[in-house]
Regions:
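N-terminal localization/anchoring segments of enzymes in phospholipid and broader phosphate metabolism
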Residues: 1-215, 224, 233, 237, ...
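Hydrophobic alpha/beta core scaffold segments
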Residues: 240-244
Length: 474
């Protein structure tokens, strides 16, 4: 079916919205246009004094870069860190860096020994009340084209503390210095892996105390030895671990005595899964991060990556629902066996089909307007009183949940107990499942078969075959 990024209402103003609460955009299900509009507005806002951005991959016709050049031409300080070693985009980045410099932007070319792979934007405003910030931290590139093909997450906030941390990161990048201290932000190589290992230790300690601890990790690849060993330790401690890993995976799931509580799946669908979400549940609270970096050693130790801990309960709810949806996927998913092979996930008899990617459109369809389902859910959860003795009476028996749903709920007890979550996923299954398996479908009308004439290619010389081979290799 046709799928297009969902657009906000015509009067939607991201810069104004972020002053009310943090915002999370999910590409390609939601359009990148609000972010571009925010940059263009900042380029002409008299209160904006500077825009700083890290650029790794850009579109060949980039509205984002055009907005930066407009800002510089309007007298604002524009700092762009362009990574010239982005594989396959070297020439494109060189061309854009020249145009940025010509427009009056300050262009930084990063470190000699570290690639700057982070996705970070900082808009600084000065008014009568003082300085204020709008900070954007993402998992994907500032590329309008790939934002319609890759699944990524973009966190935008006006939190002053995060703005100060982002400003510190840019100051360090300007003098080729690594960031050593941060609170809510993850900044590799010094404040990325160490923070995530601390989060895992917190969950392991909760498991030793008998709490229902769990970890959910979604990224592209994992090879870092320290993280793998910590995951094994968590599994042996009884922590339920669910991993969604699209690419390289150097840890095996379900190995008795080592990773028997670790479950790994890969999602390959219409869009390239590119987002990174790291969720840690200690039996009482969820601490969740999004980041630009995977768990490859090159990301954790050899690159400048940036992530952030999301604290807005609405966005924590939203990210948790996204993870749960992907753990319920039985259309695009393949699960790892203990021998390292993968087996396609097939729905059980009578179980509804759940396509995690197409289901995102239903999950986010009302996200631009108020009240958001997650904001309403969080408000109900905060105001809900303690259950009384009468309220604790057993409810009528319900139809037993499908196996995939049980597994997803077990991986994160907090999300399973949250109000409205089950109803929303029940509706989601009905919307995503376009055709019920039990309903007979009429056979499509047969089309007449046309004869196809296949021409026999002329014989090629050995030299011609070699040249054609190298053309294909390109």
């Amino acid at each position: 079916p046709a799928a297009r990024p969902m657009l906000p209402p015509p009067d939607y103003d991201l810069a104004a919205e972020v002053q009310k609460h943090d915002v999370l955009l999910s590409y390609p299900y939601q359009s990148i246009r609000p972010f571009i509009a925010m940059l263009k507005k900042a380029a002409h806002d008299p209160e904006v004094i500077s825009i700083k951005m890290t650029l790794y991959r850009m579109a060949r016709e980039s509205q984002i870069v055009q907005a930066l050049m407009e800002a510089a031409e309007n007298g604002k300080e524009v700092v762009a860190l362009v990574e010239l070693r982005a594989r396959f985009d070297e020439q494109n980045n060189i061309d854009w860096s020249k145009q940025l410099e010509s427009a009056g932007c300050t262009v930084i070319y990063g470190f000699d020994d570290y690639k700057v792979h982070s996705k970070l934007t900082l808009i600084t405003k000065k008014s009568k009340e003082g300085y204020s910030y709008i900070t954007q931290i993402g998992t994907g590139n500032y590329n309008e084209k790939t934002s319609e093909l890759y699944t990524d997450y973009s966190f935008i906030t006006a939190d002053h503390g995060i703005g100060e941390e982002a400003s510190n990161v840019f100051q360090n990048l300007a003098v080729q210095k690594l960031t050593e201290e941060s609170d809510r932000m993850l900044v590799a190589p010094l404040r990325f892996k160490s923070v995530l290992l601390e989060e895992m230790d917190r969950v392991i300690a909760a498991a030793h105390m008998g709490r229902p601890a769990s970890i959910i990790l979604k990224n592209n690849s994992i090879s870092d030895r320290d993280i793998i060993l910590k995951l094994q330790e968590a599994s042996c401690a009884g922590v339920r671990i669910d991993m969604i890993v699209r690419g390289i995976c150097c840890v095996r799931a379900g190995v008795p005595g080592k990773t028997e509580n670790l479950h790994i799946r890969s999602l390959v669908g219409r869009y390239l899964e590119h987002g990174r979400i790291y969720s840690f549940f200690d039996g009482a609270h969820t601490r969740i991060y999004i980041a630009s970096g995977d768990f490859l050693t090159r990301n954790t130790e050899c690159r400048v990556e940036v992530g952030v801990r999301v604290e807005d309960p609405v966005l924590v709810r939203k990210l948790t629902d996204i993870l749960q949806l992907q753990l319920r996927d039985n259309v695009n998913a393949r699960e790892m066996r203990p021998d390292g092979s993968y087996q396609k996930v097939k729905p059980a008899e009578g179980e509804a089909l759940v396509n995690g990617q197409m289901g995102m459109y239903e999950l986010l369809k009302n996200d631009w307007t108020q009240p958001e389902p997650w904001r309403l859910s969080a408000a109900v959860q905060e105001k809900q009183p303690e259950p009384s003795a009468e309220a604790a009476k057993p409810e009528p028996a319900k139809t037993e949940a499908a196996p995939a749903a049980k597994q997803a709920e077990a991986s994160h007890p907090e999300s399973a107990a949250a109000p409205e979550s089950g109803d929303r996923f029940d509706q989601l299954e009905q919307m995503v499942n376009h055709k019920k398996r039990t309903e007979p479908q009429p056979a499509p009308a047969a089309k007449p078969i046309k004869p196809v004439v296949v021409e026999t290619p002329a014989p090629r010389s050995r030299l011609k075959r070699i040249l054609d081979f190298f053309k294909l290799r390109r």
